[in-house]
Structure formats: structure tokens, C-alpha cells
């Protein structure tokens, strides 16, 4: 499937993934993230239920603590 992730095109060898499964394809390890799917913020507790499909647009933001 073809996605737009943080403004860049990305191909995934799957027809549909949960957001949790999609995040595991990214090189970010176990860092906590915020996700926007097609302009809508997705709650972390919904990551297993919400799906990513061909043509979707995602923004994935890593949360970093600092002082």
C-alpha cells in the first residue's frame, strides 16, 4: 500500500495494518509517539483498533522529554 508519512511517500507490503503494526515498521524503536491519521489525532489506546489503508496520510511525532 502507498502512504504519505510526515509528508513523504512510503510503500508498505500489506493491504491493511493497525496503527500499532504500522509503527513497528518505522525505525523508532519503542519510543512513544503521537499519531495523526488523515488529519485526525488518534489516541494511543486506539492504536490496535484503528487501521492504516492505501492512500492514508499520517503524521508520526516522537515524544521526547527534556529540560
Q: Can you annotate each of these PLM segments?
A:
Residues 1-66:
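Ubiquitin-like/PB1-type beta-grasp interaction modules and other compact soluble beta-rich domains
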Amino acid at each position: 500500500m502507498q502512504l504519505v508519512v510526515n509528508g513523504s511517500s512510503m510503500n508498505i507490503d500489506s493491504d491493511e495494518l493497525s496503527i500499532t503494526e504500522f509503527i513497528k515498521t518505522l525505525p523508532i524503536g519503542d519510543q512513544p509517539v503521537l499519531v495523526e491519521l488523515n488529519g485526525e489525532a488518534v489516541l494511543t489506546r486506539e492504536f490496535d483498533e484503528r487501521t492504516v489503508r492505501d492512500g492514508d496520510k499520517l503524521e508520526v511525532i516522537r515524544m521526547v522529554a527534556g529540560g
